[in-house]
Amino acid sequence: VKKKILLKGPLLTRSGYGEQARFALRSLRSREDLFEVFIQPLRWGQTSWTSDMDEERLWIDQTIEKTIGYIQQGGQFDVSLQVTIPNEFERLAPFNVGYTAGIETTKIAHQWIPKANEMDKVIVVSSHSKQVFENTEYQAQNTQTGEQVLLKTQIPVEAVGYPVKTFDNLPELELGLSTAFNFLTVAQFGPRKNLQNTIKWFVEEFRNDDVGLVVKSNIAKNCLMDRNKLHGDLTNFLRQQGERQCKVYLLHGDMTDAEMHSLYNNERIDAFVSLPHGEGFGLPLFEAAYSGLPVVTVGWSGQLDFLVDTEGQEQFYNVAFDLQPVQKEVVWDGVIAAESMWAYAREGSAKEKMRLCYENVKNDTVAWNNTRLSERFSENVMYENFINALGIEIDYDWMKTLSQIEII
């Protein structure tokens, strides 16, 4: 009577969608009384594959083998859960759920709407993504009748964030930082993350201070070739910024979740800064915040779900921004629409908030903390939220009967 559910997604990759797929899997595994899980893994662009070999990875590998055999024998599924961009949604079962990060801009691509409407339910990672899905409309023409129609998402869209990660023991990281105060930023080196401006404005603001910026980044992969390319680009870029006392450190390479949390909790890391144009959710921001780091970021998009508390109070250094059209070079047909907009951090505000954060931490006058995030976003709470968001009818009468059966 368990529902046979096919989880299709890049759950073995080091990517945002990989993180989503693993969260979906953990949610499903928290209710093994309801679901029999099958897995179809996907690649994800140029991103690296995870190297972890733990109980979960072994279970995934065994389940992939089971799935291949089941499909070869003509096996069918009750539910599909597809972790990908909406362009790739398809009907694979009687009940289909699309699980996407959604969008970091003000508008979803028109191609997403009919694909989303093929699903029975769509789950996104933030209130921002949910609102953009629900509010995007296009005027379209019926190719058969010539009639004008309104293109709009018609199916239910639910937002579910990520859970906090907890560790019994964190590995010790020796960072070798020589500066007295250090900001951390974690981002792939691409246009959306706005890393060049983040680094440039940091250098200009702290040019003569004993302050460092640790940049955990890559271009596409965590390999040596990627590191050498990024190191060269960053060195050339910093050379153009002139003489300085402040320092920029490049941290590159594959790091486990435990190692990343050791980085957030390292005694030499004092604050987190990120000035992206938009976030579906903003996982590094979330992890930094619940690890107790003061956060400097833009007050727009997915990160507001956790950087604003349940009473509506901001728990971060809010950098002012302007909503402007996305850059021409990031327009991606079928994903990032040319007519969409995202946030551009204001230079003066970014420098002012970084400086204020620096002074507050030094003087121990940071006015807030994010300790309650561990309760709001606990694993149990988020797994339950995700299972509920699936919208699958569960035969609770059968479960009740099952619980009453006595073992003789």
Protein language model regions, located:
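Conserved donor-binding/catalytic core segment of Leloir-type glycosyltransferases
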Residues: L6, G176-K193, I199-F202, L213-V215
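Aromatic "clamp/platform" in nucleotide-sugar-dependent glycosyltransferases that forms part
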Residues: H277
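Short hydrophobic beta-strand element within catalytic cores of glycosyltransferases
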Residues: P294-T297, V308, E314-N318
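Extended catalytic core of nucleotide-activated donor transferases of GT-like folds
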Residues: L6-K8, Q46-V132
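N-terminal pre-catalytic "stem/leader" segment of glycosyltransferase-like enzymes
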Residues: V1-Q76, E384
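Nucleotide-activated donor-binding/catalytic signature segment of Leloir-type glycosyltransferases, i.e.
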Residues: L224-L263, D270-A271
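A charged, aromatic-enriched C-terminal amphipathic alpha-helix characteristic of glycosyltransferases
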Residues: M341-S349, E359-L390
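Donor nucleotide-sugar binding/catalytic pocket of nucleotide-sugar-dependent glycosyltransferases
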Residues: K121-N169, A320
